[in-house]
């Protein structure tokens, strides 16, 4: 962790040494929107895209069925890099911008007035918007993603909101997440009286949080380092060697090569396209994508046993809302949080294959069961639908515009799961796991339950925003 003061000094030096950067210039229009095929290879840092494996299942509510509840758990929209991500990007930018020779090969575009995509450190951690984008034509801002999502949500689920126009939207107190929730609320229109319930990510929140990992002292990002370190990173060496051979004296390292992938992804968020992305070969993108899958799988997914307990906190609450749907006036439940919290939730819900681990020996293709970017691109959204068909009710999940059936329970209409069978399934998923006990939450909080869905109208949640 870089201390804030040291980071600010280093960042100031790097920016002062870099080329002058005019904000909001017009780009080559032909380039904007031309790199969508790269999004799945950038580990969830690039702009939103729909879940590729849609199985051909229509997302419409099955004919003859009536929707009775929908829950949405969403990620913040497209953003600038975090401070830790930016540190690595600025280090490689410093080397490149201070290179005194003519750029050759893959970096030759830098000879043509290239503009760096982070003009000011105040943008770090922030959502990309129409105001702060480096290019005024950028179609991938987090702001517009959230607003577009809201209009699509209203078109599909608006009938459930007609009789309950006063409702909350739940968000963590991360500013970019709060901003996403606010943009979403604004785009729903003025026909609703919406209150943003802002929940602290501080560990003292215990179980009453949308960011359970922050309240889990036992979570350890290094728990599976021995596994992760065994994956070959020769592809990074190949990138740095190639760029150094083309530009003698540049002296990029393997770490710099890794940072170029982040540069590529976040520049897409801020600019709508990225020349840096064109540096990589198809094979290098595949290797990088798989490495991000590995890291995520063994840190925040099925490859780390504790994750099922962390995700149980939110999954248990969502199941409870489904059970109570007939007795609750509110039929639409909207929540916004971080990517890792969504991955934890999906892991516990069983929507991610946990029957086999990912190998570090090679990139598997036929048996590649976990794609981080597919589940949590910027602006990711997971819907839980409950609908009634004749006298029976059913539950199913929609992840990033695609129905993702429960593998062991999908015989209902639209490949849904019959309600009673779903509760048995959920009980089995939660058997033997306890967020509070497995995480030793008592070390940081006395809050043993997630209550905000039920007490928001009597307990006002208004945690101060933090830029993280």
UniProtKB/Swiss-Prot annotation:
<feature type="glycosylation site" description="N-linked (GlcNAc...) asparagine">
    <location>
        <position position="391"/>
    </location>
</feature>
<feature type="glycosylation site" description="N-linked (GlcNAc...) asparagine">
    <location>
        <position position="98"/>
    </location>
</feature>
<comment type="similarity">
    <text>Belongs to the histidine acid phosphatase family.</text>
</comment>
<dbReference type="Pfam" id="PF00328">
    <property type="entry name" value="His_Phos_2"/>
</dbReference>
<dbReference type="GO" id="GO:0001403">
    <property type="term" value="P:invasive growth in response to glucose limitation"/>
</dbReference>
<feature type="glycosylation site" description="N-linked (GlcNAc...) asparagine">
    <location>
        <position position="251"/>
    </location>
</feature>
<dbReference type="InterPro" id="IPR033379">
    <property type="entry name" value="Acid_Pase_AS"/>
</dbReference>
<dbReference type="GO" id="GO:0009277">
    <property type="term" value="C:fungal-type cell wall"/>
</dbReference>
<protein>
    <recommendedName>
        <fullName>Probable acid phosphatase DIA3</fullName>
        <ecNumber>3.1.3.2</ecNumber>
    </recommendedName>
</protein>
<feature type="glycosylation site" description="N-linked (GlcNAc...) asparagine">
    <location>
        <position position="462"/>
    </location>
</feature>
<feature type="glycosylation site" description="N-linked (GlcNAc...) asparagine">
    <location>
        <position position="193"/>
    </location>
</feature>
<keyword id="KW-0732">Signal</keyword>
<dbReference type="InterPro" id="IPR016274">
    <property type="entry name" value="Histidine_acid_Pase_euk"/>
</dbReference>
<feature type="glycosylation site" description="N-linked (GlcNAc...) asparagine">
    <location>
        <position position="457"/>
    </location>
</feature>
<feature type="glycosylation site" description="N-linked (GlcNAc...) asparagine">
    <location>
        <position position="316"/>
    </location>
</feature>
<feature type="active site" description="Nucleophile">
    <location>
        <position position="76"/>
    </location>
</feature>
<feature type="glycosylation site" description="N-linked (GlcNAc...) asparagine">
    <location>
        <position position="163"/>
    </location>
</feature>
<feature type="signal peptide">
    <location>
        <begin position="1"/>
        <end position="20"/>
    </location>
</feature>
<feature type="glycosylation site" description="N-linked (GlcNAc...) asparagine">
    <location>
        <position position="238"/>
    </location>
</feature>
<keyword id="KW-0325">Glycoprotein</keyword>
<dbReference type="InterPro" id="IPR029033">
    <property type="entry name" value="His_PPase_superfam"/>
</dbReference>
<feature type="active site" description="Proton donor">
    <location>
        <position position="339"/>
    </location>
</feature>
<feature type="glycosylation site" description="N-linked (GlcNAc...) asparagine">
    <location>
        <position position="357"/>
    </location>
</feature>
<dbReference type="GO" id="GO:0007124">
    <property type="term" value="P:pseudohyphal growth"/>
</dbReference>
<dbReference type="GO" id="GO:0071944">
    <property type="term" value="C:cell periphery"/>
</dbReference>
<keyword id="KW-0378">Hydrolase</keyword>
<feature type="glycosylation site" description="N-linked (GlcNAc...) asparagine">
    <location>
        <position position="202"/>
    </location>
</feature>
<dbReference type="GO" id="GO:0003993">
    <property type="term" value="F:acid phosphatase activity"/>
</dbReference>
<dbReference type="InterPro" id="IPR000560">
    <property type="entry name" value="His_Pase_clade-2"/>
</dbReference>
């Amino acid at each position: 962790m870089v201390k804030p003061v040291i980071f600010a000094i280093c960042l100031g030096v790097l920016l002062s040494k870099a080329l002058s950067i005019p904000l909001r210039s017009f780009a080559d229009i032909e380039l904007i929107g031309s790199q969508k095929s790269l999004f799945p290879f950038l580990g969830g840092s690039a702009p939103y895209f729909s879940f590729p494996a849609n199985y051909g299942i229509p997302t419409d509510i099955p004919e003859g069925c009536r929707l009775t509840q929908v829950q949405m758990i969403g990620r913040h929209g497209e953003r600038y890099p975090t401070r830790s991500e930016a540190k690595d990007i600025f280090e490689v930018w410093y080397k490149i911008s201070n290179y005194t020779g003519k750029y050759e090969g893959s970096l030759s575009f830098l000879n043509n007035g290239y503009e760096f995509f982070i003009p000011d450190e105040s943008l770090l951690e922030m959502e990309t918007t129409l105001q702060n984008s480096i290019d005024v034509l950028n179609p991938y801002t987090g702001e517009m993603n959230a607003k577009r999502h809201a209009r699509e949500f209203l078109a599909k689920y608006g009938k459930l909101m007609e009789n309950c126009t006063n409702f909350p939207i739940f968000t963590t107190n991360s500013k970019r997440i709060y901003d996403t929730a606010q943009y979403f609320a604004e785009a729903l229109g003025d026909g609703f009286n919406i209150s943003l319930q802002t929940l602290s990510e501080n560990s003292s929140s215990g179980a009453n949080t949308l960011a359970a990992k922050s309240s889990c002292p036992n979570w350890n990002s290094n728990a599976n380092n021995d596994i992760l370190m065994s994956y070959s990173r020769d592809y990074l060496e190949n990138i740095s060697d190639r760029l150094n051979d083309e530009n003698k004296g540049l002296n990029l390292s393997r770490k710099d090569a890794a940072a170029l992938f982040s540069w590529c992804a976040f520049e897409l968020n801020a600019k709508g396209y990225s020349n840096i992305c064109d540096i990589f070969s198809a094979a290098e993108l595949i290797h990088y994508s798989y490495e991000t899958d590995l890291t995520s799988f063994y840190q925040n997914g099925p490859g780390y046993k504790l994750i099922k307990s962390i995700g149980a906190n939110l999954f248990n609450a969502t199941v409870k809302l489904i059970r109570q749907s007939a007795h609750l006036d509110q039929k639409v439940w909207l929540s916004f949080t971080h990517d890792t919290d969504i991955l934890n939730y999906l892991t516990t819900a069983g929507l991610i294959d946990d029957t086999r681990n990912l190998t570090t020996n090679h990139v598997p293709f036929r048996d590649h069961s976990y794609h981080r970017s597919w589940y949590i691109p910027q602006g990711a959204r997971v819907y839980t639908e409950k609908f009634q068909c004749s006298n029976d009710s059913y539950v199913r999940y929609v992840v990033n515009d695609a129905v993702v059936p429960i593998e062991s329970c999908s015989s209902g209409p639209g490949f849904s799961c019959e309600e009673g069978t779903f509760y048995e399934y959920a009980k089995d998923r939660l058997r033997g796991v306890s967020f509070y006990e497995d995480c030793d939450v008592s070390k940081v909080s006395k809050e043993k339950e997630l209550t905000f869905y039920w007490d928001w109208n009597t307990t006002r949640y208004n945690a101060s925003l933090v830029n993280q």
